[in-house]
Amino acid sequence: MEASPASGPRHLMDPHIFTSNFNNGIGRHKTYLCYEVERLDNGTSVKMDQHRGFLHNQAKNLLCGFYGRHAELRFLDLVPSLQLDPAQIYRVTWFISWSPCFSWGCAGEVRAFLQENTHVRLRIFAARIYDYDPLYKEALQMLRDAGAQVSIMTYDEFKHCWDTFVDHQGCPFQPWDGLDEHSQALSGRLRAILQNQGN
């Protein structure tokens, strides 16, 4: 079940769904996006717990004429309901199972959102780089150029997600085999992509 932007009880993710979608495995076809919003005030941040939750992409159903909706765009769809005051500065943090794509418009839509909403700062922590998209480097560079801070999730971010967004029933986060090595390798790849201005 997904979190609602409205006030009320917050839904939590099933532990198996979290682990299977955020771990190092390949062949995952869904993108999960956990989000939280903070108001920045004189160098301090104020967490806005009512603006915290998770969502995932909607699969296409061509029989109904529905072409699907990526998780990043679904988040942008709910932003108006968050009623973020343009006179305040906000930091939105995404913990996302795949980095945003280029070919299906996600990076471009996020860039447009950031350009139109200069009171919002975006941090993206991705579990994996979406290199199935041939233009994935362009997507990451576009996000960087739009002012988004893009990083790879490490143990700390996975644990934070587990503690914050998962119905863990009191069980502590158990890192999977290769988590640190995988995060370090992806961080190196991402650093190289973001440092390359031309490609």
UniProtKB/Swiss-Prot annotation:
<comment type="subunit">
    <text>Interacts with AGO2. Interacts with TRIB3 (via N-terminus).</text>
</comment>
<keyword id="KW-0963">Cytoplasm</keyword>
<dbReference type="GO" id="GO:0045071">
    <property type="term" value="P:negative regulation of viral genome replication"/>
</dbReference>
<dbReference type="GO" id="GO:0005634">
    <property type="term" value="C:nucleus"/>
</dbReference>
<keyword id="KW-0399">Innate immunity</keyword>
<dbReference type="InterPro" id="IPR002125">
    <property type="entry name" value="CMP_dCMP_dom"/>
</dbReference>
<feature type="active site" description="Proton donor">
    <location>
        <position position="72"/>
    </location>
</feature>
<dbReference type="Pfam" id="PF18782">
    <property type="entry name" value="NAD2"/>
</dbReference>
<dbReference type="GO" id="GO:0070383">
    <property type="term" value="P:DNA cytosine deamination"/>
</dbReference>
<keyword id="KW-0051">Antiviral defense</keyword>
<protein>
    <recommendedName>
        <fullName>DNA dC-&gt;dU-editing enzyme APOBEC-3A</fullName>
        <ecNumber>3.5.4.38</ecNumber>
    </recommendedName>
</protein>
<comment type="similarity">
    <text>Belongs to the cytidine and deoxycytidylate deaminase family.</text>
</comment>
<keyword id="KW-0862">Zinc</keyword>
<dbReference type="GO" id="GO:0016554">
    <property type="term" value="P:cytidine to uridine editing"/>
</dbReference>
<dbReference type="GO" id="GO:0051607">
    <property type="term" value="P:defense response to virus"/>
</dbReference>
<dbReference type="GO" id="GO:0005737">
    <property type="term" value="C:cytoplasm"/>
</dbReference>
<dbReference type="GO" id="GO:0044355">
    <property type="term" value="P:clearance of foreign intracellular DNA"/>
</dbReference>
<dbReference type="GO" id="GO:0045869">
    <property type="term" value="P:negative regulation of single stranded viral RNA replication via double stranded DNA intermediate"/>
</dbReference>
<feature type="binding site">
    <location>
        <position position="70"/>
    </location>
    <ligand>
        <name>Zn(2+)</name>
    </ligand>
</feature>
<feature type="binding site">
    <location>
        <position position="101"/>
    </location>
    <ligand>
        <name>Zn(2+)</name>
    </ligand>
</feature>
<keyword id="KW-0479">Metal-binding</keyword>
<dbReference type="GO" id="GO:0004126">
    <property type="term" value="F:cytidine deaminase activity"/>
</dbReference>
<dbReference type="GO" id="GO:0000932">
    <property type="term" value="C:P-body"/>
</dbReference>
<dbReference type="InterPro" id="IPR050610">
    <property type="entry name" value="APOBEC_Cyt_Deaminase"/>
</dbReference>
<dbReference type="GO" id="GO:0008270">
    <property type="term" value="F:zinc ion binding"/>
</dbReference>
<dbReference type="GO" id="GO:0005654">
    <property type="term" value="C:nucleoplasm"/>
</dbReference>
<dbReference type="GO" id="GO:0045087">
    <property type="term" value="P:innate immune response"/>
</dbReference>
<dbReference type="GO" id="GO:0044029">
    <property type="term" value="P:positive regulation of gene expression via chromosomal CpG island demethylation"/>
</dbReference>
<keyword id="KW-0378">Hydrolase</keyword>
<keyword id="KW-0539">Nucleus</keyword>
<feature type="binding site">
    <location>
        <position position="106"/>
    </location>
    <ligand>
        <name>Zn(2+)</name>
    </ligand>
</feature>
<dbReference type="InterPro" id="IPR016193">
    <property type="entry name" value="Cytidine_deaminase-like"/>
</dbReference>
<dbReference type="InterPro" id="IPR016192">
    <property type="entry name" value="APOBEC/CMP_deaminase_Zn-bd"/>
</dbReference>
<dbReference type="GO" id="GO:0003723">
    <property type="term" value="F:RNA binding"/>
</dbReference>
<feature type="domain" description="CMP/dCMP-type deaminase">
    <location>
        <begin position="27"/>
        <end position="143"/>
    </location>
</feature>
<dbReference type="GO" id="GO:0010526">
    <property type="term" value="P:transposable element silencing"/>
</dbReference>
<comment type="function">
    <text>DNA deaminase (cytidine deaminase) with restriction activity against viruses, foreign DNA and mobility of retrotransposons. Exhibits antiviral activity against adeno-associated virus (AAV) and human T-cell leukemia virus type 1 (HTLV-1) and may inhibit the mobility of LTR and non-LTR retrotransposons. Selectively targets single-stranded DNA and can deaminate both methylcytosine and cytosine in foreign DNA. Can induce somatic hypermutation in the nuclear and mitochondrial DNA. May also play a role in the epigenetic regulation of gene expression through the process of active DNA demethylation.</text>
</comment>
<keyword id="KW-0391">Immunity</keyword>
